[in-house]
Design a protein with these regions (language model features):
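Core alpha/beta nucleotide-donor-binding catalytic domains of modification enzymes
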Residues: 7-147, 157-161, 166
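Class I S-adenosyl-L-methionine
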Residues: 85-95, 109-282
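Extended charged
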Residues: 1-4
Length: 288
């Protein structure tokens, strides 16, 4: 007899509906860079923040963002051009959080990594040619200009691995010169109420004049106390959102799985097994 999976009670339930959500907008003001369709913006809104604007270079993504979030300020342009603007509204100089997810493909373990560093990338979608691996520093330059209370930046785990660690050292150095104490954390979405394993690194930076009152700084890379980032959420297993009785997934998804190529998934053991992982949290590529 197959086990029946009883879904755990999650502190941050993933089964929520937009019409049931109250956006209080009372926690502070946020501006989002590299905003794409607004994934991080939705998170801030659910948490009670007022996301007043965004920056995005892709016209299609900006259209999606504006349709979903109706920003007060939107800048469809290269972040390097945004940094140079001399007509930014005064409200952007009084932000609580500057948020950004600089392009990560050049640091991803599934990307070109070192072979792509320092090289301009041309996009088939038509947006401006850019050197992707330096955009993080342009984001910090914007932080230096706007002086928000807190800066939060997200990127892939690969930024912490191999030769990419030199970028992390410069990120810390540039944040210090911009006037911020910096800490970084490698977080796993499966420990935070998300039904997939997705590891991302987050840089959380506090402005010097605020952090000096409660932070102990021994050197550039050692700022204490560390922010408590332990969410301790129960993992959401495949069987919880696919089939509580542990039945295999449908033919379409199983065929997709069988036609996968090397690198599609992190679990090597899955190559010769069926897809009915009722007691496992699926890796990113299969969590659909």
């Amino acid at each position: 007899m197959k086990d029946v999976i009883t879904p755990p009670q999650h502190l941050y339930p993933y089964r929520w509906f937009l019409e049931d959500t109250v956006f209080t907008k009372d926690k502070g003001k946020v501006f989002s860079c590299f905003a794409c369709g607004g994934g991080s913006t939705m998170g801030y809104k659910i948490a009670g923040y007022d996301v007043i604007g965004c920056n995005e270079i892709d016209p299609r993504m900006m259209k999606c963002y504006e349709t979903n979030h109706h920003p007060q300020y939107s800048y469809l342009e290269d972040i390097r051009d945004l940094v140079k603007r001399n007509n930014l509204p005064e409200e952007l100089y009084h932000l609580d959080i500057l948020d950004g997810s600089p392009p990560c493909s050049t640091f991803s373990m599934s990307g070109l990594r070192e072979d792509a560093w320092g090289k301009e990338k041309k996009f088939k979608e038509g947006q401006k040619t850019q050197v992707l691996d330096t955009l993080f520093f342009d984001f910090i330059a914007l932080a230096k200009r706007l002086k928000p209370k807190v800066v939060i930046a997200e990127n892939v785990k690969g930024l912490l691995l191999g030769n990419a660690i030199d970028y992390v050292r410069r990120i810390y150095k540039d944040f210090e010169e911009a006037g911020y104490y910096c800490q970084h954390f490698l977080l796993d979405a499966s420990k935070m109420g998300v039904p997939q394993k997705r590891e991302r690194v987050f840089f959380i930076c506090i402005r010097h004049d605020l952090g000096v009152h409660f932070l102990k700084v021994s050197d550039l890379f050692n700022v204490e106390p560390y922010i408590d980032m332990e969410f301790n959420e129960s993992e959401i297993y495949y069987g919880e959102y696919a089939d509580y009785k542990g039945k295999p997934i449908g033919v379409k998804m199983r065929k997709l799985f069988e036609q996968r190529v090397a690198g599609d998934i992190a679990l090597a053991e899955a190559y010769k097994k069926p897809v009915s992982y009722t007691h496992l949290t699926l890796p990113t590529m299969l969590a659909v």
